[in-house]
Regions:
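Pyridoxal 5′-phosphate
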Residues: 1-428
Length: 428
């Protein structure tokens, strides 16, 4: 028995967590921000945490860790229709998006200095938008954010026109597979067709899509795809960028070159093991999950609208694999500040979101809703309820019971435009 095993064997253990007690446990409706880890992923990760070995080392412990990494790479690739050599491990979705956007821009521009344009959409996650803005400011990139319709769906004809204006100057196209705020699924086949007709590579942020809708990298024709573990029931701090083998990328950071010489850093074998297990299970269960979660989502929307008749749902109303993510319910509540509603619901033990958790706390209206044509007041008056593998009918019941009084209280407090002290007063 090694020192760690001895410590674990004799350390006092707390009692295992009990089953849900609805009176005290929170109702978690924020799966789009992060979904609870699957028990199988926890077990896979825990099994490796008690083992020592750098995957880059040549001794037996290192080779064992390397075997875990490579087997995990193969499992993830098989689950999403990719080749193992195409899976580049990263620290998560944000790093993957940065590597895709910056790395591809630099590589393509180095090949041909005319390639300075990047085409994307106005509803991307900030993990794509912010690197684009950085490239525009520091590298002279010509970033063009293409319009979307009132459902947040890309105008493919606008993309076609932008490409045909001068396709030889476009370094890349980046369009998210599914929107993280309103759940709208983009017409990725059309995007790939338009871009590839001019030899332009396409990146997609599929963080919200993997495990929710069918994702097949090879069949999609995409060149780069971002995914992350904590959105599919895996651990935080690990993700991947899937890159076609023939595509060149410039690295963001330099060091050991562990991942195809485009990503350096010691690989986290335990987290990668948990990641692989989560991806496998999420993809395997996707079809059954879709039907169950769609039904719960539709029930939630119908009953919330019955409680608050002037509320409105944002995004594509159809729950289908080519229209909207199954667990996304994004609603505008007129006369209420979204942050205020969030705090009032949180005080009742219900967790939801006003949008992307990565930008939560920033007092700005949703850029996604603004791009969809909503005004600032509407963009500030919305909540996202996102359902996932732990969601039950009792969770929906709890929200439906709370939403009417919460909206009434928020409106009575007169909090529109002043979420800060007024929201805290309403919540208290």
């Amino acid at each position: 028995m090694n020192d760690l095993s001895r410590t674990l064997a004799f350390a006092p253990m707390s009692s295992p967590p009990s089953a849900r007690a609805p009176a005290t446990d929170p109702v978690y409706l924020d799966h789009a921000a992060s979904t609870p880890m699957l028990a199988e992923a926890v077990a896979a990760m825990t099994e490796q945490l008690v083992r020592t070995g750098n995957p880059s080392s040549l001794h037996a412990s290192g080779r064992a860790a390397r075997r875990v990494v490579e087997e995990s790479r193969e499992r993830i690739a098989a689950a999403i229709g990719a080749r193992p050599a195409e899976v580049v491990f990263t620290s998560g979705g944000t790093e993957s998006d940065n590597l895709a956007v910056k790395g591809l821009f630099w590589a393509r521009r180095d090949e041909d200095p005319r390639r300075t344009r990047i085409l994307s959409t106005a509803v991307e996650h900030h993990a794509v938008l912010d690197p684009l803005h950085w490239l525009a400011e520091h590298e002279g990139a010509g970033v063009e954010l293409l319009p979307v319709d009132s459902l947040a769906r890309l105008d493919v004809e606008a993309l076609r026109a932008a490409v045909e204006r001068d396709g030889s100057s476009v370094a890349l196209v980046s369009v998210m597979w599914a929107n993280n705020e309103v759940g709208t699924i983009q017409p990725m086949a059309d995007v790939v067709e338009v871009a590839h007709a001019h030899g332009i590579p396409v990146h997609t942020d599929a963080v919200q899509a993997v495990g929710q809708v069918p994702v097949d990298f090879a069949a999609s024709g995409l060149d780069l795809l971002t995914l992350t573990a904590h959105k599919v029931g895996g651990p935080y701090g690990v993700g991947a960028l899937v890159v076609r083998r023939e595509l060149a990328l410039a690295p963001l950071q330099h060091g050991g070159g562990q991942e195809r010489d485009v990503r350096s850093g010691t690989l986290d074998a335990p987290a990668i093991a948990g990641f692989a297990t989560a991806v496998e299970l999420a993809v395997k269960r996707q079809a059954k999950h879709f039907d169950r979660i769609c039904a719960l989502r539709n029930d939630l929307v119908e009953r919330v609208l019955a409680q608050v008749p002037d509320a409105a749902m944002n995004g594509d109303p159809l729950c289908a694999v080519d229209h909207r993510l199954p667990g996304n319910a994004h609603l505008t509540f007129p006369g209420c500040e979204g942050d205020s509603l969030l705090m009032l619901l949180d005080a009742r033990g219900i967790a939801c979101s006003t949008g992307s958790a990565c930008s939560a706390g920033v007092p700005q209206p949703s850029h996604v809703l603004l791009a969809m044509g909503r005004d600032e007041e509407q963009a500030r008056s919305s909540l996202r309820f996102s359902l996932g593998h732990t969601t039950t009918t009792s969770d929906v019941d709890a929200l439906v019971e709370a939403i009417g009084p919460v909206v009434e209280r928020a409106r009575a407090a007169g909090v529109v435009g002043g979420a800060g002290s007024a929201a805290r007063k309403a919540a208290g």
